Amino acid sequence: MGNLLADKVALVTGAGRGIGRAIAIVMAGEGAKVALTGRNIQPLDQVADEIQQAGGDATSWQLDVSSENQVEDVVRKISGLWGKIDILVNNAAIIHHDTPVWSTPIEEWDEEMAINLRGTFLCCHYVLPQMVERQEGIVINIGSSSGTIPESEFGAYGATKWGVIGYTTSLARSVRPHGVRVNGLNPGWVETGMTAGQKPKDAGPEWTQPQDIARAALFLAAHAPADMTGQFINLFGANDRSGHAPGPI
């Protein structure tokens, strides 16, 4: 166990698997109390058990980030349990694979917008007031290479991530005077359940792992310069070196 985040409380959305799980484990390993949130409680409980068995502190909370009532309630309960939230990691996201932009079903578009973009906004909306009041806090929003490079087959997902990037940079400017830093990560292809079976044949033998993204998140939470805000770190990895346009996480 390390102590880079000792006495800090981190809320991680989409923490039951993949990138969110890895970020939660890394932050707990550096001393943070971690609130794990997601739509399915069972994987969250499993991650919490893993963290606790390693000597860390974690709790699990069922949460649909697209629901304002649920976000408000869970943020209130976490703040009541641990007194504050120091670090917010907006990781929760979904993707509908292989849907051409022009024929994206409306229900798929709406669902991705609700979770990926609205969910990020709602969590910030209900966590930031306490950070602003304390004049300190860190927000880490997970974007995607699809938010910087157009993807013909991931239209809705790419649009949500373009939105997350734009929202992040605007939010950073508005809360900077209050001591709150807002940054993000743009992963490319990461080996997670969400990308299972989607790895391009020309992407090369290497594939970015969730732990790689988690280490970058730890940098933003513990090592980033005090004046670093409104910035995204691109993590396209070996996929980009292969010449294949990076795809979504």
Q: Where in the sequence are the language-model features?
A:
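Alpha-helical segment proximal to the catalytic Tyr-Lys
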Residues: 129, 173-174, 226
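C-terminal helical subdomain
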Residues: 177, 184-185, 202-241
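Active-site helix of classical SDR
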Residues: 124, 160
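Substrate-binding pocket helix/loop in short-chain dehydrogenase/reductase
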Residues: 99-101, 108-113
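Conserved glycine-rich cofactor-binding loop
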Residues: 9, 16-18
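The beta1-alpha1 cofactor-binding region of Rossmann-like NAD(H)/NADP(H)-dependent oxidoreductases
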Residues: 41, 63-74, 106, 211
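Residue(s) in the substrate-gating loop at a strand-loop-helix junction
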Residues: 144
